[in-house]
């Protein structure tokens, strides 16, 4: 069974800061608190429209984090250049649409193998480990292995948004099957999107899971209980699921 890690996404600390155009709350300070509370890594999504995390945030976080930076980004020339210059520990390549509220669905790796292969090779040459954010789909998992990504991150949105227990169980089975296939192909398996304190345990219990990236639920809880307590509680639930 893989060791289970928690990556805390701090995008919405920046969302709150940018809502008033101030310099607070500071994502760098939030990252430090999250690390102290047990986060194994810090995830940030540098979007093309810079709606929350900024280039400056990325630079400072890379210099100050005590754990690992996971930079989520679209597969564009601009973002690849920023990643190669900044050299985060991990890059998670995601699809991106300007009009979306949050990332909707996974990358179509199978439909753009050459582009993904080139991006993975370029990032790997800079010493960056690459993850591809994909749906729990056999075709996409096979394609991820073919293009040379060492990690995938399974999109858990359909599981998280399921309206009935039966629908959620079906999505969980799909994720479990996808994780098993990925591990068999030599891929390390992460997961994220829509995971909360109420639904995380079933995903955390899957033996192939290496890291869960969780943001909105933790920041939402932090408003009520404080960030340190919110991160620690999520980590406790994840480890509890592993027995």
UniProtKB/Swiss-Prot annotation:
Homooctamer; tetramer of dimers. Pathway: Cofactor biosynthesis; pyridoxine 5'-phosphate biosynthesis; pyridoxine 5'-phosphate from D-erythrose 4-phosphate: step 5/5. Its main location: cytoplasm. This is Pyridoxine 5'-phosphate synthase. It is found in: Cytoplasm. CDD domains: PNPsynthase (cd00003). The lineage of its organism: Bacteria, Pseudomonadati, Pseudomonadota, Gammaproteobacteria, Enterobacterales. The record marks 153 as: Transition state stabilizer. Its EC number is 2.6.99.2. Pfam families: PdxJ (PF03740). The active site is at 45 (proton acceptor), 72 (proton acceptor), 193 (proton donor). GO terms for cellular component: cytosol. It is an enzyme of class 2 (transferase). Coiled coil: none annotated.
């Amino acid at each position: 069974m893989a060791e289970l890690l928690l990556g805390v996404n701090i995008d919405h600390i920046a969302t709150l800061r940018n809502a008033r155009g101030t310099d607070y709350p500071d994502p760098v300070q939030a990252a430090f608190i999250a690390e102290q509370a047990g986060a194994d890594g810090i995830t940030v999504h540098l979007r093309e429209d810079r709606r929350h995390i900024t280039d400056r945030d990325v630079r400072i976080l890379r210099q100050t984090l005590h754990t690992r930076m996971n930079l989520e980004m679209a597969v564009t020339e601009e973002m690849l250049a920023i990643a190669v210059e900044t050299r985060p520990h991990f890059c998670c390549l995601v699809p991106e649409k300007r009009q979306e509220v949050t990332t909707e669905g996974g990358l179509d790796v199978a439909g753009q193998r050459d582009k993904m292969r080139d991006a993975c090779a370029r990032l790997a040459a800079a010493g960056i480990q690459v993850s591809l954010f994909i749906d729990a789909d056999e075709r996409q998992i096979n394609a991820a292995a073919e293009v040379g990504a060492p990690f995938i991150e399974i999109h858990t949105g359909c599981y998280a948004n399921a309206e009935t227990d039966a629908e959620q169980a079906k999505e969980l089975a799909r994720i479990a099957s996808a994780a098993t296939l990925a591990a068999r192909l030599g891929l390390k398996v992460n997961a994220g999107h829509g995971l909360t304190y109420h639904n995380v345990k079933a995903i955390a219990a899957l033996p192939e899971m290496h890291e869960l990236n969780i943001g909105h639920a933790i920041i939402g809880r932090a408003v009520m209980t404080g960030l340190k307590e919110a991160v620690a509680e999520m980590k406790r639930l994840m480890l509890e699921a592993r027995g």
